């Protein structure tokens, strides 16, 4: 099964399923490895994610997590925490911006924006983000 997450500053939207038409969708609070410690993330996964899973966590073979704060060392920390819960899965952690680009543009080139608690934009080449101006951050009111 596939486990997919889109996490922003206020919530995480989750999807679990074998294909786009047969899955289950639910929400937990936000998960941000830049602002949250591994123990806080662990508590969110244990108390909010696991109860929603309709199958054993071991049935999740591929995980794609797109989230705010997911870059550099934050990705590695989050991957280690998720691997503690679902150790046999292929775990992929990417930025929320790449998630937005992939969901809107697929394999096509273009510009995509996120307008939410935090705001951002980028140019996408159909595979990866190729140009991005660093936002001010939601604390400074980049919306």
Give the predicted meaning of each segment:
Residues 2-6, 60-64, 110-114:
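Short glycine-aspartate micro-motif
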Residues 2-43, 129-130, 135-137:
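Short glycine-rich, Thr/Ser-proximal phosphate-binding strand/loop in the N-terminal lobe
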Residues 39-54:
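Short, well-ordered amphipathic alpha-helical segments that serve as non-catalytic structural scaffolds
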Residues 89-113:
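Conserved phosphate-binding catalytic cores of ATP/NTP-utilizing and phosphoryl-transfer enzymes
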Residues 19-22, 80-85, 110, 126-131:
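A glycine- and small-aliphatic-rich helix-loop capping segment at beta-alpha/alpha-beta transitions
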